[in-house]
Amino acid sequence: FEQYTTALEMTLLAKGERGKKEALSKRVAVLLESDTQKIQDLYNKMKDFYRYRSESLHEGNGQNITVSELKDLEEIVRRVLVKYLEFCKVAIQTAPTVTWDTIKRDKISDLKNSVSTVISSGILPA
């Protein structure tokens, strides 16, 4: 469970970024969903998953994580990575010498803009 959330953090968060749970939950939701209810549902699910991850990592209590939740998170990570690879492919085709750091920075910027739009629309909390 912790490895999956770490993979999401490394992909969707800037180094040293604060408010990881909120930022990660919002970015995953807007990256993977477009329907209002699905965005809200995934946002809430990711917040729960991040809380489970924190409890498991910091308190050594991973008993609250079910097999179903583990499979859900695995599928979310798979979907995020597929979307990211598609974004990378387009970026490399456009600029063959682009670096991972630039691609990541650009994608995070895109996601921040998407999150701002969704917050402005009242779909997610500020």
What are these regions (language model features)?
Residues 1-126:
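Amphipathic, oligomerization/interface secondary-structure segments
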